[in-house]
Amino acid sequence: MKKTRQSNVELLRLLAMFMVLLLHAVQSFQWPRGGFLMSQPLLVHLGFSFVEMISVVAVNVFVLISGWFGIRPTMRGLGKFLYQCVFCCLVVDAVLWAVGAENLSFSMLFEAFTLRQTGWFVPSYLLLFLLSPVLNAYVETADEQTQRRVLISLFVAQSVGAFVLKIFADFNYGYSLLSFACLYLLAQYVRRFQLQRLARLRSSFFLLIFFGVALLHTLVGSIALFGFGSKVFQQIILYSSPLVVVQALALLLYFTRQTLSSTLVNRIAAGSFAVYLIHQHPGARPFYASICQKAFMDAPPAPGAAALLLWLCVVYLVCVGVDELRRASWELLLSRRKAEKS
């Protein structure tokens, strides 16, 4: 039986992918090292910093959502995920070839079918998908005390050992299966054992934590940037930062408290992963970055910011539209397979 999607969480999934667009838009200016932004007024600097601080949670939020509901791995689910990745890569390759920006070659097709055009996230999430039966079995059998101790140990290792002391390379600053597994187990633990206790808190409390951490990061990061350089600034907003993890969890808890039912939200959110796959394709990334720069730099800050947001919305809608084609082709393949079996 097909599960009904919870629109409140699907809205968060949709928002998280827009945060990815925002984050990469900010990074297209080589922030915080870029000379253009450093020459702008303080208000522009603080604005870009704050946008980065609220957007950096996107990856953690995406993984936490998977942990909240639990991944139920099936061959069909795996096939659907891989098909989406390959389809989006091939669409970008086809467009690049059509406009003369890329030559059609065996190596291009090989990279598309082996997921080499999907960046670091897809391989890590694919490994999480494959490992999920083990994680699910653990959370279903281990008691609350055991899970709490394991989580404390893992996050101390990540926060202190990897983030501060940098002695556990396997966490890779949050860009790894190990960090994904920690987030997955955290979401499962909170949903299974802490919801009753957290129910005493208002939903606005979690939103306050989210924006409060973002504001704190903005202020501390700005002081670090101008006082100690961009390297320190970048260290405080790694995915493995304990405050970034808390910020992401707070945002998830806020949205789980909301009530929403929307077929449109569910539909758009279902295709939102295509946004990442398409705009982060190695061939599309420079084009995306150049338009982000042009949109903001060719106008005063306020109109430039509006133009930049409009561009991000266009990218989002185009990518979701491409995923609708992917969805239709996937359903066509399934229907033909059923017809052949009957």
Kindly label every feature range from the protein language model.
Residues 69-70, 190, 253, 275:
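Short alpha-helical scaffold segments that flank and stabilize functional sites
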Residues 46-59, 109-124, 164-183, 217-248, ...:
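Interfacial loop-to-helix transition and helix-capping segments at the boundaries
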Residues 147-194:
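Loop-centered beta-sheet repeat module
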Residues 128-137, 184-196, 245-260:
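Alpha-helical transmembrane segments in multipass membrane proteins, preferentially the mid-helix core
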